Regions:
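Sec-dependent signal peptide recognition
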Residues: 2-8
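Beta-strand-centric surfaces of beta-sandwich/beta-rich domains
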Residues: 19-201, 207-307
């Protein structure tokens, strides 16, 4: 998508920086799961107040067989938001870490992720996230520093595999977003309209905004009939733990090509500068039953792209 890795960097004057305090946090993630592995990332220092950064780290994990992932559990310092795993065939030296670029992200395929607060994200039933043989695992670690201090970001990710020999169906991902988001100082709103380009079987949907969010609504229009999934006054804890709506995998939400998804977001930007995508967001995420093993897709301001 055009700018899923967009960041809003609100730089403060260097004179002001001289009065800021550097804060260090303890970071002790639990050990790797018995049937899985752990990826620990190099810390990122000097994260400035009022900034959002997205880093990509190419790990030393290059798959020698296809992996079937059942769950991921992310761990980050308090400004982490979130930690996400991708894979790529365009390999870099292990440990390469830099702010993610559009060119980088265009070479990645989404594998899964976690909010980064130690909450395990598990796919239900016999669903798994598939990672092919012969690819390099890449971790995207996002840091949102809404404090008045210079901070260090640290991240780790535990990956739990499905039990071998069990029946498996691939889980997929959807996103509805506008990465050209720009929020002026004060109150603002945005509407996103997406028309489905293919049939999907959805088992989970959830909204996503950051701390300046006020309200979000998500509607689906199925066969011409509108159904409201969310109508929420936003709360601070929703940033990391949003409400979600789920359907049994035996009876998923059936979305047909031509159906629509409507997302409405409202904010109150109490800072003194406009915000762009990264510092704030307006997103609806969906998880699908992807037995056909098709590419994940996202609707970015009405334009469908693979990710």
């Amino acid at each position: 998508m055009r700018r899923l890795t967009a960041v809003a960097v609100l730089t403060l004057l260097s004179a002001a920086c001289s009065h800021m305090e550097m804060i260090e946090e303890e970071f002790s993630p639990p050990p790797a799961p018995e049937n899985g592995m752990q990826i620990q990332l190099k810390e990122v220092q000097g994260l400035q107040p009022g900034t959002s950064y997205e880093y990509c780290t190419w790990t030393d994990q290059i798959t020698t067989t296809e992996l079937s992932v059942k769950a991921m559990e992310g761990f980050q310092t308090k400004i982490g938001h979130p930690v996400t795993m991708f894979y790529t065939t365009k390999m870099q030296p292990p440990g390469t870490t830099r702010e993610c670029t559009e060119m980088d992200m265009a070479s990645f395929r989404f594998a899964g992720g976690s909010a980064g607060e130690g909450a395990e994200s598990v796919v239900p039933g016999n669903l798994v996230y598939k990672i092919p043989k012969g690819v390099q695992l890449v971790v995207n670690h996002h840091y949102l520093n809404a404090t008045q201090n210079v901070l260090t970001g640290k991240s780790a990710l535990n990956i739990r595999f499905a039990d071998p020999g069990t029946p498996q169906v691939t889980a997929g991902h959807l996103a509805y977003v506008n990465t050209e988001l720009r929020i002026p100082v004060g109150k603002a709103s945005m509407d996103i309209l997406c028309t489905m380009k293919r049939d999907e079987k959805v088992w989970r949907m959830l909204p996503h905004m950051h701390r300046w969010g006020q309200t979000t609504r998500i509607d689906v229009v199925l066969g011409g009939q509108s159904q409201r999934l969310f109508d929420l006054p936003w709360q601070d804890d929703f940033t990391f733990h949003p409400p979600e709506k789920t359907w049994p995998i035996e009876q998923p939400l059936l979305m047909k090509a031509g159906d629509q998804v409507k997302v409405h977001c409202e904010w109150d930007n109490t800072t003194d500068k406009p915000m762009t995508f990264g510092m704030e967001m307006c997103v609806a995420f969906g998880n699908t039953i992807n037995a056909e093993e098709r590419e994940n897709i996202a609707c970015d301001n009405g334009e469908w792209v693979e990710f």
